[in-house]
């Protein structure tokens, strides 16, 4: 292990490729996570705008977060909804999942759609400054096309949810 941190670890693997060549792979170990596409009764997607230091800008994203040790993904999804947008869902459905960036990390994200939203907040994480934005479903593709939504997990999650819209 090269580094052990609060939310990630870094390790170096030496592998043998299919062509019998030894190669080094640097791997970021990351807990699995959830991403949720919440849709209200008026056909708006509730997104969060928050500052992302590596990108050095505020990004418009779906609510998302890490799955705690021993926590089931659907429980984590409901917790993140309550923490980030102040709602719970009476209709939470798993859409599938995806590897966030399999070239260097083992992070797997479970993607959910949340409907039938009810106010039910939990305290937000101390280090998060989040603003909730309500976006009509029919504007989502334009926001992606014109670079207003640039976060990969958000684009992937919205794409997975589009058949439901």
Predicted features and spans:
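Residue-level structural signal for beta-strand termini and adjacent loop
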Residues: 27-28, 51, 100
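Acidic, metal-coordinating catalytic segment for phosphate/diphosphate chemistry
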Residues: 2-35, 41
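Conserved Nudix-box catalytic region and its N-terminal flanking loop in Nudix hydrolases
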Residues: 34-79
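Unchanged
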Residues: 23, 32-35, 67-152
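Short loop segments at secondary-structure junctions
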Residues: 18-19, 40-42, 51, 114-119, ...
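Short beta-strand micro-motifs in enzyme catalytic cores
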Residues: 9-13, 58, 108-110, 131
């Amino acid at each position: 292990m090269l580094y052990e941190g609060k939310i990630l670890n870094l390790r170096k693997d030496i592998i043998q490729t299919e062509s019998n060549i030894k190669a080094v792979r640097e791997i970021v170990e990351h807990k699995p996570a959830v991403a949720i596409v919440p849709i209200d009764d008026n056909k708006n997607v509730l997104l969060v705008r928050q500052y992302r230091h590596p990108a050095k800008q505020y990004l418009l994203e779906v609510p998302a977060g890490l799955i705690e040790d021993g926590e089931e993904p659907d429980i984590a999804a409901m917790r993140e909804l309550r923490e980030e947008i102040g709602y719970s869902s009476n209709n939470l459905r798993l859409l599938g999942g995806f590897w966030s960036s399999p070239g260097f990390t083992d992070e797997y994200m479970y993607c959910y759609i949340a409907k039938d939203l009810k106010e039910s907040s939990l305290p937000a994480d101390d280090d998060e400054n989040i603003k909730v934005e309500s976006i009509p479903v029919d504007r989502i593709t334009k926001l992606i096309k014109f670079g207003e939504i640039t976060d990969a997990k958000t684009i992937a999650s919205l794409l997975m949810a589009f058949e439901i819209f």
